[in-house]
């Protein structure tokens, strides 16, 4: 160890000690930061699209559909729990509708989550499969669901309702809230809310729409 010659006066001694402590502190901090930022995971962490498998099933299921009969051969009836408004009170009920068969479990999970939510979102009208004579509409293949059309309208670029009346989230219990249970339950599973379309469609949720 090298000898350190301290000056006799107290001021010099204090300065030397401070320098030694400062150097030791910087060395310790450097070691800590090096350990923090030099960490490397043992293996690559995969982060796949959680909806990829289901999207592929849907794609395979509808690729050969060209007629109403073919579309309806791929549908199933589902029954889900819902809330209704009766005499100003929310009561539990069930709703039955048709949906593409490979989406049935997904749809059941969505409505069970909505039903268990604090919001207790009430459903007055629900449309699942509906033959529109065109495959531009996902309703024709059972890939879309509309909720309470009157209170969740489709509007043009000027905000004028094309279908339905008015959207009043927060004041009208049938209107879908952007940050509510309904939107969260659908979008977390890869469904797209029509409010994000250029022609906003607040009632509409479609699976794997681009």
Language-model features, listed with the residues they occupy:
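Active-site acidic/histidine clusters and adjacent loop/turn architecture
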Residues: 58-126
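Catalytic cores and adjacent binding grooves of peptidoglycan-active enzymes
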Residues: 136, 141-210
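Structured beta-strand-rich cores of soluble
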Residues: 33-64
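Boundary at the C-terminal end of the N-terminal hydrophobic targeting segment
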Residues: 27-29
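Active-site-adjacent loop/helix surface patches within enzyme catalytic domains
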Residues: 109-146, 151-154
């Amino acid at each position: 160890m090298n000898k350190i010659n301290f000056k006799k006066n107290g001021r010099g001694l204090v300065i030397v000690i401070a320098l030694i402590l400062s150097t030791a502190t910087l060395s310790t901090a450097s070691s800590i930061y090096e350990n923090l930022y030099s960490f490397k995971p043992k293996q690559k962490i995969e982060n796949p699209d959680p909806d990829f498998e289901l999207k592929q099933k849907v794609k395979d299921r509808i690729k050969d559909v060209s007629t109403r009969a073919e579309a309806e051969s791929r549908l199933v009836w589902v029954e889900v729990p819902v809330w209704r408004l009766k005499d100003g009170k929310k009561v539990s009920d069930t709703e039955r509708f048709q949906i593409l068969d490979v989406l049935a479990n997904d749809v059941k999970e969505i409505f069970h989550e909505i039903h268990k939510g604090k919001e207790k979102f009430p459903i007055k009208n629900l449309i699942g499969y509906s033959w529109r004579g065109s495959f531009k509409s996902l309703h024709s293949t059972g890939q879309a669901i509309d909720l309470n059309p009157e209170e969740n309208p489709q509007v043009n670029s000027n905000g004028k309702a094309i279908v339905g009346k008015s959207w009043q989230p927060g004041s009208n219990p049938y209107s879908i809230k952007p940050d509510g249970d309904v939107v969260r339950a659908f979008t977390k599973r890869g469904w797209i809310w029509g409010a994000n379309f250029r022609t906003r469609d607040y009632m509409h949720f479609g699976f794997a729409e681009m």
